[in-house]
Amino acid sequence: MPGPASFFVTPIQVTVPNELTSEAELLKFFAVSAAELKKIWWFRSRMYQKFEISKGKGKKRLISAPDHRLKMLQTKIASSLAPIYRPRNPVHGFVDNRSVKTNATAHLRSKFIMNLDIEGFFSAITEGRVSGLMSALGIDGRVAEILARICCNEGVLPQGAPSSPIISNMICFRMDKQLQRIAKESRCIYTRYADDVTFSSYQPLTLLFEGPPPPAGNFSPDLLKDGLRGAFRSNGFAINPQKVHYADKHSRRTVTGLKINEIVNVDRKFVRNIRAALFVVEKQGAAVAQKTLKDKYGREAALASHLRGRISWVGHIKGPSDPIFRSLASRYNKLFPSEKLEILPTIVEIRERAVWVVEHWGGDATEGSVQGTAFFLKSVGLVTAWHCVDGATEIAVYHPSKPSNKFKVTVAKNDAHRDLAVLAHEIPATEYYEFDISKRTFKAGDNTTALGFPGFGPGDKINVRSGLITSLPIKSAVPMIEVAQKLSQGMSGGPLLDEDGAVAGINYKGGPSEARDFAVHVKALTDWLSVA
């Protein structure tokens, strides 16, 4: 295997943080004395607790967890290295705003998948390699030696130390560039999540193999092109021969444990295991379930925390409004009421409680009331069209499920030119949900949903009308959205939603007597409020 220095032929051009410029600055940053550093230097192995966790299929993963003092120093080192490291696009492990989900999403709808695993990933990164990395960054040699000593145990990078993730990514920086180039030349997608490497394409991954691609299933890494195997080898890593898998369009395709078909999804077996665990708690009690958990993982683990983490994972992958997540979370909340999971409302539930009837009376009582629609918008309040409340002496809003429970409101802000109004109210927050403001850039052909109460009468419910954006005109300097669906009288002031259920616009005018149907673009609202 090449020596540590050979991995970094030329120095890497970065700005070294002040705390890493000398031993004196480092000690000051650590808030430790030279004597204390000496103790850590010689007795660091005593500062780790080792234990195993289950990886499934009877396999175990060794975790080396540092004690509080050493963990604090490693966390400080990680924070100092963070501004230096600029992750490449294919890297998803241990990177802010990236995750197993983003890693899998990169391969969404690919028909051919190749999964590789780096053998002994953390243990392959030796103390000498870490010291060599630090020196290549331009860090003082003595400081590089100290950093490597604190971050490593028994001569290698320990799995369980807070500094190991970023250091491992920095060590892989050159390899990621090489694998990214190979993927580009082979016309496929490359990603890496820690030790999990994935290549995918819409076509067979022929250019990654010396011969034709193997049949779906596990295969020998010897079938891979020497250049691909060499990229791992030249960077001090080896491909795990037990974890090399190829999947074609007729087989099950997974990336970092997630299924990728039309959407990224959780394996059904994972969900079944959660349901089984909840069933044991429901029928036999927490004590029996706790014992089962200990027997499986070989150590004490809080049952509630274990289930909470797994159910939260389902919600992260499938979405907080997914019915499977909501069902699991609801069962969990009944069993562990003191540690409840938040169950967010679905898009349908939000729109059912976020859209209200607005009713106003003018100066002439003989004219009766005029009705329109209003809705609640996050960070804005209760929004409607100005023409729905223009000239009103009294305004009330109510939810159609409680027509007798009317709330008096007043106009807080209005813009007649844009036909917009924000209403001041004292409605309890428990009575309504709020929409998000859309962040999309719209174009003709995008799907929309208009909500409102046309010709509202007793017993009526919210009217939902689906359609497309037909054009995006600007009328008298006001951006508008023209839609295909009819916006009948009474829907004015209601929300026009995008495909995500966020507000794209405010219904303006339309109906059978109008040739065209318009909503005021939500940008007109946000621009107005930013200067109002």
What does each model-identified segment do?
Residues E431-M480, K486-S492, N507-F518:
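Flexible, gly/ser-rich surface segments that form the specificity/activation loops bordering the active-site cleft
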Residues D195-F199, L382-T384, D419-E426, I481-V483:
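A generic structural motif
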Residues V358, A374, V380, T384, ...:
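Terminal peptide-recognition signature
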Residues M1-I53, K60-R86, P90-L116, F121-S123, ...:
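Right-hand nucleic-acid polymerase module
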Residues L497-A532:
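C-terminal subregion of chymotrypsin/trypsin-like serine protease catalytic domains
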Residues W361, G368-Q371, L377-D419, I427-P428, ...:
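Catalytic-histidine neighborhood of serine endopeptidases
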